[in-house]
Amino acid sequence: MPGGANGTPFFLATGNLNVSLYNVVGSELLWVDGPISLQSEAMVTMCDFQGQSCALPGVYAQAGWFLTGEHRPYDRKQGTIDRVIPKENFGYNAAGGSGAWEVATRFSWLDLSDHDIKGGQLTDWTAGINWYWNPYTKLVFNYVHSMANVSGSPQSQTDMFGLRAQVDF
């Protein structure tokens, strides 16, 4: 089955589900203490599929540490994480600094199988380095180890390396 824009297959897929009712419930936690942050989210989609009540849960937990001393800003009134502001912006000239460097790790798990829904289970472990050049630009380097278990298929594993450049304005 084709996946994203480049045609790579999805690890998990339920196909189109004809459900009569569904609800999504989730909770998110964030803790920040100086350069260290912990974040987690859990969600479950509950649905009525072919007369059966089904639950499709997912969860992630991640930790990050800014090697250069920055912190992850949090706006309590809005309940949002704001952009990271490096102590020194990255620059090629003598006035430029090294930007902000963060090491991070993440665990995620998704279960798309319940009763007659056979979408499979996926577990990911991620290690990454985030390099914030300035408040609007960052590079993300990730290594991801994924383990998929889909009914009727042998368990599969894959290792991925990713690089993403992000500009936020």
Regions found by a protein language model. Give the residues of each.
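Outer-membrane beta-barrel pore domains
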Residues: M1-F169
